[in-house]
C-alpha cells in the first residue's frame, strides 16, 4: 500500500543540520509517509549520517552533483503518495505539521497547494521572527503577483496537480519554487495555514550578491512568463518594475525594495 505522504528533501554537504531535519520528519505523529532524501553529490559526512538510519520509511537517492531543481524533480518522480511535502535539509518540521496539513487537505479537496507559517531561526536555532503568510486563495493570488507567499519548506502539494504542470522548471537554478506556485495557481486553489509549523533556518551565506542577482533575473523571467501565459492579468505588468529596478540598484538598497513589495 502506498504511503499517505511523500516527503522530498535534497541535501548537499548538509552534515551540520541534516540529522535534526531528518529526525523532525521521522518523529511526526502522523507516521504514514516515506522520506526521500536526495544526496546531491555531498563530499562531507552527509552519506554517513544517512547510512546510520534503519527506518524503512527513509530512502536515500545518491547522485553526482546536479543542483537543487534537478534533485527535487528526481525525488518527486520516485514518490508513491498522492501528497508530496517538502523540507529543506537545514530546516525542521514541527511535530503537528503533517497531521494539520493532511486534515486541511482532506477537508478542502479543491486546494492543491498548502503551505504554513514558520519561525525563522539563526544557525544556532535562536528565534529571529515568526512569519504568518496570507491564508486564503484570494489573498495568496494578490500576493503572488508581487512576491513569493509560500515558505518552500512548508508546502504540501497534491501529486496530480504537480503532474499537470510538469514539476519544477530545471532551467531555473533559483526561484524554482516561485515559478512552480505560479503555474500551480492555474490548475488548483491555494492556501496557507497561519500556524508556524516549520523552523526555517536563515544562514549568513544564503543569498550572496551574485545569487541575489540571479534570483532577481529569474523573478523577472517568471513574471514575464506568467503575463504571457495569462496566469497574471495584463495590469500586473507593473510588478515587473520591482525586479527591474532592483537589478540596477546597489545591493545594499535591494532589501528596502523587497520589504516594500512584501508590505504591498
Model-assigned labels for residue ranges:
Residues 3-6, 34, 179:
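Cell-envelope/extracellular polymer assembly enzymes that use nucleotide-activated donors
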Residues 16-19, 44-52, 92, 96:
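Acidic helix N-cap motif at the loop->helix transition within catalytic regions
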Residues 23-32:
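Short, acidic, metal-binding catalytic loop of nucleotide-sugar glycosyltransferases
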Residues 24, 39-48, 66, 88:
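A conserved acidic beta->alpha catalytic loop
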Residues 63-79, 100:
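Glycine-rich, basic loop-to-helix element that forms the pyrophosphate-binding segment
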Residues 77, 116, 130-220:
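Conserved nucleotide-sugar donor-binding catalytic segment
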Residues 84:
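Short aromatic/hydrophobic "clamp" motif used to bind/position activated sugar donors
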Residues 96-128:
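Conserved donor NDP-sugar-binding/catalytic core segment of glycosyltransferases
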Amino acid at each position: 500500500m502506498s504511503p499517505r505522504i511523500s516527503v522530498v528533501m535534497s541535501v548537499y554537504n548538509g552534515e551540520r543540520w541534516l540529522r535534526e531535519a531528518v529526525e523532525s520528519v521521522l518523529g511526526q505523529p502522523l507516521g504514514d509517509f516515506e522520506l526521500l532524501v536526495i544526496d546531491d553529490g555531498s563530499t562531507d559526512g552527509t552519506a554517513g549520517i544517512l547510512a546510520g538510519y534503519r527506518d524503512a520509511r527513509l530512502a536515500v537517492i545518491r547522485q553526482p552533483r546536479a543542483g537543487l531543481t534537478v534533485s527535487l524533480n528526481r525525488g518527486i518522480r520516485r514518490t508513491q503518495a498522492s501528497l508530496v511535502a517538502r523540507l529543506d535539509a537545514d530546516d525542521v518540521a514541527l511535530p503537528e505539521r503533517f497531521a494539520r496539513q493532511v486534515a486541511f487537505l482532506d477537508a478542502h479537496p479543491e486546494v492543491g497547494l498548502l503551505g504554513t507559517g514558520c519561525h525563522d531561526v539563526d544557525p544556532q536555532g535562536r528565534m529571529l521572527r515568526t512569519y504568518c503568510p496570507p491564508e486564503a486563495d484570494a489573498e495568496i493570488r494578490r500576493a503572488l503577483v508581487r512576491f513569493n507567499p509560500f515558505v518552500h519548506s512548508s508546502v504540501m502539494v497534491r501529486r496530480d496537480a504537480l503532474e499537470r504542470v510538469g514539476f519544477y522548471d530545471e532551467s531555473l537554478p533559483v526561484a524554482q519554487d516561485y515559478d512552480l506556485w505560479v503555474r500551480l495557481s492555474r490548475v488548483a486553489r491555494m492556501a496557507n495555514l497561519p500556524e508556524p509549523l516549520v523552523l526555517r533556518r536563515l544562514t549568513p551565506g544564503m543569498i550572496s550578491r551574485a545569487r541575489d542577482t540571479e534570483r532577481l533575473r529569474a523573478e523577472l523571467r517568471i513574471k514575464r512568463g506568467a503575463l504571457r501565459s495569462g496566469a497574471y492579468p495584463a495590469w500586473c505588468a507593473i510588478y515587473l518594475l520591482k525586479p527591474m529596478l532592483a537589478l540596477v540598484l546597489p545591493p545594499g538598497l535591494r532589501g528596502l525594495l523587497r520589504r516594500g513589495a512584501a508590505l504591498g
